Amino acid sequence: MLEVKLPGLDLKNPIIPASGCFGFGKEFSRFYDLSCLGAIMIKATTKEPRFGNPTPRVAETGAGMLNAIGLQNPGLDSVLHHELPWLEQFDTPIIANVAGSQVDDYVEVAEHISKAPNVHALELNISCPNVKTGGIAFGTNPEMAADLTKAVKEVSDVPVYVKLSPNVANITEIALAIEEAGADGLTMINTLIGMRLDLKTGKPILANKTGGLSGPAVKPVAIRMVYEVSQMVNIPIIGMGGVQTAEDALEFLLAGASAVAVGTANFVNPFACPEIIEQLPSVLLQYGYQSIEECIGRSWNHEKQPAHHRA
């Protein structure tokens, strides 16, 4: 009922912890067997280790959080020799998130990490708003996004998904350029740029001043963008942005996503992903669906009728 087939990914269910909200899975493995997950999007990997931005790097908001971590990670060598081998014990495909400051950085990381036996797909992080070079610069320019996608596709041994930024005037234009460049899929959305101020000092709470807004506050934006982009491209979308419940996951599927990533909710409830997986079948049945496939794009593809509406 929950199985989903995507380029490079045979998912037992469509629920995936989002990159940056799950580390490399070690902390969460103390709570449950990671083999229950559809896939795991590991933390962004760069060529060299990164220590990230100065603190404070996280601030709560009324319906979510701001983060300005700055792609902190142990670097490519450590991920290849320590993190990925540790994850081999789980029966779950890995989606490796690749980041960098320039095209050559992405290409080098992608070429090596795509050869790891348990990496089934790459996620190009072209939309991180919290780093001074690379990151979001690639995600806001169609030509740059396309050139980067082409370069990585040439060296990758596995399908390439590209993570889209919501901080653009026309996200569909970016998506179409990336599809034209050969991407196998899209993941969307990354965080919205936001800020909070300390009332005592009058200054920004985050040392980076701005940060990425995530959590329930961004879900309506994410749903709208998935809805728009999914009607224009012919490659699958992994939707994300404020998913906390099985009902949220279904909403993304109806908007046009083929799978759903869970981010900030993991910080609030470490059992968020397995709970959504457990509850999703009953939620699908409640609304008349017998499979994930029936739901995908139902909001705009009205030929897809729920089972209980069929003759």
From Swiss-Prot:
One of its GO terms (biological process) is 'de novo' pyrimidine nucleobase biosynthetic process. The active site is at 128 (nucleophile). Keywords: Cytoplasm, Flavoprotein, FMN, NAD, Oxidoreductase, Pyrimidine biosynthesis. GO terms for cellular component: cytoplasm. It comes from the Bacteria. Binds 1 FMN per subunit. This is Dihydroorotate dehydrogenase B (NAD(+)), catalytic subunit. It comes from Bacillus subtilis (strain 168). The lineage of its organism: Bacteria, Bacillati, Bacillota, Bacilli, Bacillales.
